Amino acid sequence: MDTKIDFKDPAYYENRELSWIKFDQRVLSEARDKSIPLLERLKFVSITSSNLDEFFMVRVASLKDMVHAKYKKRDIAGMTATEQLSAINKQARELVNIQYSTFSRSLMPLLRKEGIYLLDAHEDLNEEQARFVDRYFMENVYPVLTPMAVDRSEEHTSELQ
């Protein structure tokens, strides 16, 4: 029996964007692994969050541009930009729900047991703590802040000409 595989068949491919979310699911699974040290687990939640930020700023923004431009071509996995956005919306929501649950219901109680507390707001600080945080931010953080994303306008590149 001679069966040939049609490598153009979308069934053989995973959508690039959805595979990114699956990767983040695997990263987040490390945060749920009780055999991993607590602060490492917290780091995996942070990595997932950072990855999702970049994913939405770059990949989802690109798909939205395609939809806006009425680009209808399907990717190698057979999905249009609109279909990808719909699937991303569903899967990213599920991922963020698991991420939030992992952080707030699993890791935060364990962190508190270790004497590590996260404050919800500036209002949780007493006056002395608030002054310290404000001063620290202005002296150490603010001076090195740089934009992580810029728009495509010429304002940012006009000085280069």
Predicted regions and their residues:
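N- or domain-start disorder-to-order transition segments that initiate the globular core
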Residues: D2-K8
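Extended, charged alpha-helical coiled-coil/arm scaffolds that mediate oligomerization and mechanical coupling
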Residues: I116-E139, P143, P147-M148
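N-terminal-proximal low-complexity accessory segments that begin disordered
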Residues: D9-L52
